[in-house]
Amino acid sequence: MGDGAEIVTRLYGDEKKLAEDGRISELVGSDEVKDNEEEVFEEAIGSQEGLKPESLKTDVLQEDFPLASNDEVCDLEETSRNERGVENLKVNYSEIGESHGEVNEQCITTKEADSDLVTLKMNDYDHGEVADADISYGKMASSLDVVENSEKATSNLATEDVNLENGNTHSSSENGVVSPDENKELVAEVISVSACSVETGSNGIDDEKWEEEIDVSAGMVTEQRNGKTGAEFNSVKIVSGDKSLNDSIEVAAGTLSPLEKSSSEEKGETESQNSNGGHDIQSNKEIVKQQDSSVNIGPEIKESQHMERESEVLSSVSPTESRSDTAALPPARPAGLGRAAPLLEPAPRVTQQPRVNGNVSHNQPQQAEDSTTAETDEHDETREKLQFIRVKFLRLSHRLGQTPHNVVVAQVLYRLGLAEQLRGRNGSRVGAFSFDRASAMAEQLEAAAQDPLDFSCTIMVLGKSGVGKSATINSIFDELKISTDAFQVGTKKVQDIEGFVQGIKVRVIDTPGLLPSWSDQHKNEKILKSVRAFIKKSPPDIVLYLDRLDMQSRDSGDMPLLRTITDVFGPSIWFNAIVGLTHAASAPPDGPNGTASSYDMFVTQRSHVIQQAIRQAAGDMRLMNPVSLVENHSACRTNRAGQRVLPNGQVWKPHLLLLSFASKILAEANALLKLQDNIPGGQFATRSKAPPLPLLLSSLLQSRPQAKLPEQQYDDEDDEDDLDESSDSEEESEYDELPPFKRLTKAEMTKLSKSQKKEYLDEMEYREKLFMKRQMKEERKRRKLLKKFAAEIKDMPNGYSENVEEERSEPASVPVPMPDLSLPASFDSDNPTHRYRYLDTSNQWLVRPVLETHGWDHDIGYEGVNAERLFVVKDKIPVSFSGQVTKDKKDAHVQLELASSVKHGEGRSTSLGFDMQNAGKELAYTIRSETRFNKFRKNKAAAGLSVTLLGDSVSAGLKVEDKLIANKRFRMVMSGGAMTSRGDVAYGGTLEAQFRDKDYPLGRFLSTLGLSVMDWHGDLAIGGNIQSQVPIGRSSNLIARANLNNRGAGQVSIRVNSSEQLQLAVVALVPLFKKLLTYYSPEQMQYGH
């Protein structure tokens, strides 16, 4: 044969069945080894598809052999990394003359009963042992040793000698584990072979250098050949029967997979030799020539250079040799998939690296490989720890007498598997064997009773006084830990109780009872702060909040207590909280109409009330705290084992402990998988509902009158009377020049004709209007004179000024009745306005009832009470107070308003106000301030701001306003502002134009045009409305309203009211007849038939 090296992959059809000499040792692997094989297969099968070298036209097939002494057949597993390591090996060389190389590579397969398995884990890749063969004159001998070491796994480093007789070339290749410091080429290949052929005869080609570096954990073997046809190299011989190799090739135990640390028992060595005279060697004629004599990596290496590779070379008898003449079995399939089942979960393809002249470019930094290696190690370690958590939880449930089919147990195991999938690399699926193996291991450990259970749980008990906290603790430990008394407080200080329940260490923190009343929250804060100081060094794992099942309440009576707990400990206290309902053996109350209610329905309703209250207190409506029932009474029904049983057949103590242990197990899994940031409340715990910024902004943009002194209450706000004083003087003189007028009686009016009656009524209306204008004008003049006189008497003696103030501000000494309230229309025969009459007394407080206009009770329709008063501070600063409280059977609403104004300078005044009102189930507190500038007669400007506290969110707003007064009939108000909260901003503006009657307010004509714009979250809302009131005669009005927005929604309404034209009521018959006609339409008749 000529010089050079050639890799040949033996085809299944060309292999000859050779007689097998030697003996085959049997090794039965442990359960852990089996599981690891399945795991490696699942992770490796994805990369088998589409990764075949271009130069190799055939595939390596694998055979199944019958077991020698065991009927159980283990599925053959072979990873794609092995195939790359065996099939894709190429040696590039410069072909000179007739130089040929022959290397026989074997595809090594295994059977569980026929082989020894040692899987090494180095650089996050599982490299198996490679059996090295010495090929000489067609004979091959392979040997394989099984290494057993609990601390270090040794790598079988074999040397492969290829004797080429015809040429003078001697090449060797060594199998080993490549260290992370090697180049990408060494990592990509399992077996690295490089050869350089030198022809010293006729071709006259210069000598070339050949290097091979293999790092085997402890040392590196370097061989250099400079112009030599033969070389000296280091090789490690594997001695049959040895249990350890040279120290220079030992692999640290830390790189060994945890499942493989259970060493298999060595029973012998496997030797297979070829007895036939030679092997059929088929040379590969598609070898690519490379001038630089470098290693050429196949396309599959190029495509999967960055993929995670886990190769496992399985030791077995050679597929070309057999002790018997039995026919070869077809390729084995994975367990559970069947013969025709396709391979699942292909590995994701990565972007191909750029190539230069057909070779892979190795310019990627080595840090990427190191990071991938670290992630794989961390992933495998995390899976083992998570499996240990599964085993621990199954042991806990087993001790509590719960099967894996229990709802709580199944749910916890499902969450653990789901978390592992989310955390696992590339979203790898968790095999079903994880649960089976964990369950079997848990049962085995519990049956052996030798391995102690490393688990303890700390439970802190909170609850109202008298719900049974101390009694529950005694029931958990089945002994009297704390003395209880039905008439005295059991626990007066925080104390720690420890004990064992079914061999599990349980620590319970007992706390003093809390009080639900709002007035007792200060005392509760002291108790809870002492509890917080007690648990600072050793925080509890679970919080058990106890309440009574038989104390049902649908109101928010416990909300002050729950909010106090949240304020002291923070909202996170409820994330690992369990709700316990004591007195669970109580009979459910009667249902509606005296019928018996279901026990399960009663428990569900009571649980929902407490869970909803906890959600509101924590500020997270996604919380769903588990509920457990508790019964501590000695007369409670028990089962044969002496455990207390509830009316629904549940044994409450194991269920409560299982919930507590499950919560801690899930917390441990969260900490292991680093999912702490994903728990509820970590990001949204303190975030409550966002404030309604558009509503707050619209309230801010509303124009409010400023508080005034008592003598200024009836003054016109804008002093528009000064705008047209000439017209007022003319109307006043006109009234004085009117001739005398005699009023007619009803009898005299009946004698008048229709035209005469109309003229008489018109004259009467004209005279009344002029008289009312004169009265209003005189009242304004009197107010101005009093204001001027008050300014002049400031320098006078105190006694005189006090008399003037009393005359000015003292109310009437005789109470006078206030006008009757206008009650809504009803079908009652009586109009009980007399029930709502009250007197205007000399008291400064004005207290009035609040009438529910839409209520069903017209006799006594009181809904609340309203109180108002005007204070004067230092005779200059008015302070107005108004409050209203309304109460019905379910809710109570409070509305409070406090306002004041101060004048500073000419034409400038500042108002300050405080509002408190209900907003849903919370109270909204608003502080607002506004400054007005009245320097111009027809133009007035204002600027204001407000701050609103709603729940735990604070909103701040700013507005500007401008009022333009053209004359007495036309005015326009423009305002704009913005409201912000939590980084969210809403913008808005309003425009209102008003056109009044010439004789307003005596004239009834009024038209108003409004336009509003609101921008919130990029959503622009534009709305317009118009309202007009037109008088029709003396006693009729026409009111029309219309509104439209930018979304096409609008409304139009027309209303006519009259006190004389009763025939207008006939219009109400139109919709009635229209409805009746629809009942007798042909469509309805046909449908009826």
Swiss-Prot record:
Gene3D superfamilies: P-loop containing nucleotide triphosphate hydrolases (3.40.50.300). It is an enzyme of class 3 (hydrolase). Residues 158-179, 255-339, 353-381, 710-748 are annotated as: Disordered. Residues 713-737 have a biased composition (Acidic residues). Its cofactor is Mg(2+). Residues 454-683 form the AIG1-type G domain. The chain crosses the membrane at residues 1064-1080. One of its GO terms (biological process) is protein targeting to chloroplast. Residues 165-176, 353-374 have a biased composition (Polar residues). This is Translocase of chloroplast 120, chloroplastic. Its EC number is 3.6.5.-. Residues 767-788 form a coiled coil. Mg(2+) binds at residue 470. Expressed in seedlings, flowers, and roots. Keywords: Acetylation, Chloroplast, Coiled coil, Cytoplasm, GTP-binding, Hydrolase, Magnesium, Membrane, Metal-binding, Nucleotide-binding, Phosphoprotein, Plastid, Plastid outer membrane, Protein transport, Receptor, Transmembrane, Transmembrane helix, Transport. SUPFAM superfamilies: P-loop containing nucleoside triphosphate hydrolases (SSF52540). Homodimer. Part of the TOC core complex that includes 1 protein for the specific recognition of transit peptides surrounded by a ring composed of four proteins forming translocation channels, and four to five GTP-binding proteins providing energy. This core complex can interact with components of the TIC complex to form a larger import complex. Chloroplastic protein precursor such as prSS (precursor of the RuBisCO small subunit) interacts with these complexes. One of its GO terms (cellular component) is plastid. Belongs to the TRAFAC class TrmE-Era-EngA-EngB-Septin-like GTPase superfamily. AIG1/Toc34/Toc159-like paraseptin GTPase family. TOC159 subfamily.
